[in-house]
Design a protein with these regions (language model features):
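Active-site hotspot residues in diverse enzymes, especially metal/ion-binding acidic/histidine motifs
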Residues: 1-240
Length: 240
């Protein structure tokens, strides 16, 4: 299903993505919204572009899964929400950030929770379930202004990896779950559909083999300049 040619609100996107979407946001975005997600080593958090009739989000590989989530959500704002057009202006970026915040930390959810309970295990569970950083949640609370105790604010000053390590209950997520989530956001990733199309294009001579090798993250038949991992549409010749 592709909804990237329609106006979609954060609430509608949440419904389409389904329960627990933040645990593997890249896969849900592809499966439920028809937007491809690519993960590569980048010098910046990410960006979005269009290849043929498909929207593509390119995310910088990082072990900070919460950063990947917010980047994907931010780029979805540019794609799905007209007021967050990808024009590069401060207004566009602010609108995309607002979309991401409402997608991951909806106002109704934030206001339904108690932010005076000083249990760090509960705060860690909120961070894990929403798929955000302590900083992002702190910023969201500052914006929405629900009652927040000083103790909760102090907990949210804790770096996200440390809070997860020290306070996330194993009944919510195991140590292996945390590692897998971290590995997913750091692992080079290309949609299976795109890899299949690229392989077929190479086989019939419509794309260079170096393109497929680059997408797979392996040396090509002829070593290319790997000084930049930026996604170039030229590397996907034959697909569009």
């Amino acid at each position: 299903m592709s909804v990237s040619d329609k106006r979609v609100t954060p609430a509608q996107a949440r419904e389409l993505l389904g329960e627990g979407f933040s645990q593997d946001l890249a896969s849900r975005v592809e499966e439920r919204l028809g937007v491809d997600v690519i993960v590569l080593p980048l010098e910046k958090p990410g960006y979005s572009l269009q290849l043929g009739n498909r929207h593509v989000i390119v995310v910088g590989a990082t072990d900070r899964w919460f950063r990947s989530n917010f980047t994907i959500a931010h780029e979805l704002g540019h794609i799905l929400f007209p007021s967050a057009l990808n024009g590069g202006s401060r207004r566009d970026e602010d609108a995309a950030n607002a979309f991401a915040a409402e997608l991951l930390m909806p106002e109704t959810m934030i206001r339904s929770m108690s932010w005076t309970d000083t249990n760090p295990h509960l705060i860690a569970e909120h961070v894990w379930t929403m798929g955000v950083s302590t900083q992002a949640l702190r910023t969201r609370l500052d914006y929405l202004r629900p009652p927040v105790s000083d103790a909760v604010r102090s907990i949210l000053e804790t770096p996200t990896p440390r809070l997860i390590r020290e306070s996330l209950s194993s009944s919510v997520a195991s140590s292996e779950d945390v590692t897998e989530r971290m590995a997913r956001s750091a692992r080079r990733r290309f949609p299976q559909r795109l890899l299949t199309d690229l392989r077929k294009a190479v086989e019939v001579g419509r794309a260079p083999h170096a393109s497929l090798a680059w997408a797979l993250g392996v040396p090509g038949e002829e070593e290319a300049d790997e000084s930049s991992e930026e996604l170039s549409p030229d590397l996907l010749d034959g697909l569009v």
